[in-house]
Swiss-Prot record:
Effect of substituting V463A: Does not affect hydroxyisobutyrylation activity
Organism expressing this protein natively: Escherichia coli (strain K12)
Gene3D superfamilies, alphabetized: 3.40.50.11040, 3.40.630.30, P-loop containing nucleotide triphosphate hydrolases, tRNA(Met) cytidine acetyltransferase, tail domain
Protein name: tRNA(Met) cytidine acetyltransferase TmcA
Extra information: 467 endogenous Khib candidate sites significantly regulated by TmcA were identified in E.coli using a quantitative proteomics approach.
Disulfide bond positions: none
Pfam family, one: GNAT_acetyltr_2
Length: 671
């Protein structure tokens, strides 16, 4: 075939130029498969085949692609005929060598947007796959506008465009690139302080950090959220590589001349500050926006925490040439270029709402909103883009200046569960998909019917740094109330800090829950708050806030932090306590969810209850209790703790306990 000969010639040219390209095959399954095999036979290479079905040799499922990151391949096939795993697509593109093709298999072009996408099961919170017309139309626009991509459609004439030759490219030899060499020189002579290196993926920041460690005269310690992500760094650091996990490093008295923190923006800020203060020199590296990179706006705020920071950026790719067509196309398709916050939105702010249909009529507006929201966030995944475009129940507000988006709010519908399902969630018998706050209100709260109420959760909110402290965030929340009808509440879940809580409090929210362990992403306890919109919403917020006040002393003692509520010193078991204790004793409610009422039970009961008292009053570890009580593990310890709670309840009032047990055990019969 003449087209295969032309592709063979073009592939050789691409290898000389150090670039990769996308080739789309769109058509019926048989046609796509036949033409892919012809390409594979004509162009020598690895031909890694990413598909949910094992259609060919060298197959890998999208979910297993993570295991191949760090390896390199020549040519690959990405089968998106039944579902488009955007994160896997982005990750695959990063594994391809210079001179490679990424062959993208798509359904018949005209039928694509109406076809259910199997990948939607991961992000839509729907029981069945849904069609994703807005993402498909966006991708079609990108593909048809990209002069460097090749689109080969069934029953359409195929023509290979002439590509203007580029300058020859010379692959890296392992020695530092000129950009790295210059940066290394500056780091080697840096006075005591903190340096930050940011870069997109594939720019060699891990190699740079490893080369620094190998060259310094003194000792360095490496830390990171996950040791697996430091493999490249370790390779370049050689025998001087020494890794210690962040929490273990903080607990130790280790000293070194340099601390190197890989993917520093993913480490909770309070923990990072404590670590940095211990070492004379620190190098922080972070991936900027891209495949699960960090938003540039978040980085501005992050870097501002370190006065006199030396900030550097690597821009030159290492494994392919600058301006690689595949990298450019993937970035445009998955909107990896977030808001860079270089332009200040001017003029008065106007709040307006929009829905997902705007992706069809005016795609630039939701695109800018997404870029602002992802730019302000510490991490954005391609799943977020897919959810914003096509998941049901998504709503948006923008705060527009004269020429730029100054702020944005993303809301998600929640709640409205049936009475039976809400009760089953409260008891711990069921955990349906989605409904983050609505389910938590039931699963961790007092009211078994909490999830029947209908709310709208704040998923993300952002204001341009140059327009902050003008009340724009509060205007967005007020706008959400104005544009929202027939709901019981707005809700928000966030990593608790005093500054964040003051913002939500000024917006009118009521604190209803505080978690009992720190989140890995923020280093903070999770807080949940409600802004009531109906009488039922107001009653729920008041009831849960009252429970939080009763539990405040117990939570403060457990967490080691005072709660921002007025605590109630009330040791008497209430009706709500009895119900919740029965939920722990006879259903599957978690131990720490019931911390407050269990401590009140222990104060009331005269029984020994060693498993409960040991954990909650004496703060013994699970391992210690299992040894003392001769139990085989945590599961058996929890069974014993539930049995002890039941014994204590029966001893206080056997009739009431039996009635509650019978009532709650009925809730697991829900189908």
């Amino acid at each position: 075939m003449a087209e295969l000969t032309a592709l063979h010639t073009l592939t050789a040219q691409m290898k000389r130029e150090g670039i990769r390209r996308l080739l789309v095959l769109s058509g019926e399954e048989g046609w796509c498969f036949e033409h892919t095999l012809k390409l594979r036979d004509a162009l020598p290479g690895d031909w890694l085949w990413i598909s949910p079905r094992p259609d060919a040799e060298n197959h890998c499922s999208p979910s297993a692609l993570q295991t191949l990151l760090g390896r390199e391949f020549r040519h690959a096939v990405f089968d998106a005929r039944h579902g488009f795993d955007a994160a896997a697509f982005a990750a695959l593109s990063g594994t391809l060598k210079a001179g490679s093709w990424l062959v993208l298999l798509l359904p018949v072009w005209e039928e694509w947007e109406n076809q259910p996408d199997a990948d939607s099961l991961r992000w839509s919170d729907c029981p069945d796959p849904i069609a994703t017309p807005h993402f498909v139309q966006h991708l079609k626009r990108v593909l048809t506008a990209d002069n460097e991509a090749i689109l080969w459609r069934q029953n359409q004439p195929f023509s290979l465009a002439h590509f203007t030759p580029r300058t020859d490219w010379y692959p890296a030899t392992g020695a530092p690139q000129p950009e790295q060499q210059q940066l290394l020189k500056q780091l080697m002579t840096m006075p005591p302080g903190v340096a930050a290196v940011t870069a997109a993926r594939g720019r060699g920041k891990s190699a740079l950090a490893g080369q620094l460690i190998s060259r310094i005269a003194g000792r360095a310690i490496v830390t990171a959220p996950a040791k697996a992500s430091t493999d490249v760094l370790a390779q370049f650091a050689g025998e001087k590589f020494r890794f210690i996990a962040p929490d273990a490093l903080l607990a130790s008295d280790e000293q070194a001349d340099w601390l190197v923190v890989d993917e520093a923006a993913a480490i909770p800020a309070p923990l990072l500050h404590q670590l940095v203060s211990r070492f004379p020199r620190t190098l922080l590296t972070t991936t900027v926006q891209g495949y699960e990179g960090t938003g540039r706006g978040f980085l501005l705020k992050f870097c501002a925490r370190f006065p006199h920071l030396h900030r550097f950026e690597l821009q030159q790719p290492i494994r392919w040439a600058q301006g690689c067509p595949l990298e450019k196309m993937v970035s445009e398709a998955l909107v990896f270029d977030d808001e860079n916050f270089t332009h200040t939105p001017q003029g008065n702010i106007v709040i307006s709402a929009f829905e997902q249909t705007l992706w069809q009529s005016d795609p630039e507006t939701p695109l800018k909103v997404y870029q602002l929201l992802s730019g302000a966030h510490y991490r954005t995944s391609p799943l977020d883009l897919r959810r914003m475009m096509d998941a049901p129940g998504q709503h948006f507000l923008q705060a527009a200046g004269e020429n730029e988006i100054a702020g944005a709010l993303w809301l998600v519908d929640e709640g409205g569960l049936s009475q039976q399902l809400s009760q089953a969630v409260w008891a711990g018998f069921r955990r349906p998909r989605g409904n983050l706050v609505a389910q938590s209100l039931a699963a961790h709260g007092n009211n078994p019917l909490a999830a029947t109420l209908r709310g709208r959760r704040v998923s993300r909110i952002a204001v341009h740094p140059a327009r902050q402290r003008e009340g724009t965030g509060r205007q967005l929340i007020a706008g959400a109330l104005q544009y929202t009808q027939d709901l019981d509440y707005l809700s928000v879940s966030f990593g608790y800090t005093g500054e964040l809580w003051r913002f939500w409090q000024r917006c009118g929210f009521v604190l209803v829950r505080m978690g009992n362990h720190r989140e890995a992403s923020s280093g903070c306890y999770t807080a949940m708050a409600l802004l009531p919109m109906s009488d039922a919403g107001k009653q729920l917020a008041e009831r849960e806030h009252y429970r939080l006040r009763r539990d405040a002393q117990a939570l403060a003692q457990w967490n080691g932090e005072t709660l921002p509520v007025d605590p109630l010193n009330d040791a008497v078991l209430s009706d709500d306590d009895w119900l919740e204790l029965a939920g722990f004793a006879f259903a599957h409610r978690p131990l720490l969810t019931s911390l407050g009422c269990l401590l009140r039970l222990l104060q009331t009961s005269e029984l020994a209850l060693p498993a409960l008292r040991g954990r909650l009053q004496k703060n013994a570890s699970d391992a210690q209790l299992c040894t003392t009580l001769k139990l085989s593990g945590r599961k058996m310890l929890l069974v014993r703790q539930r049995e002890e709670a039941a014994q204590a309840l029966f001893a206080l009032n056997d009739v009431r306990t039996e009635r509650l047990r019978d009532r709650i055990t009925q809730w697991q019969l829900f189908h």
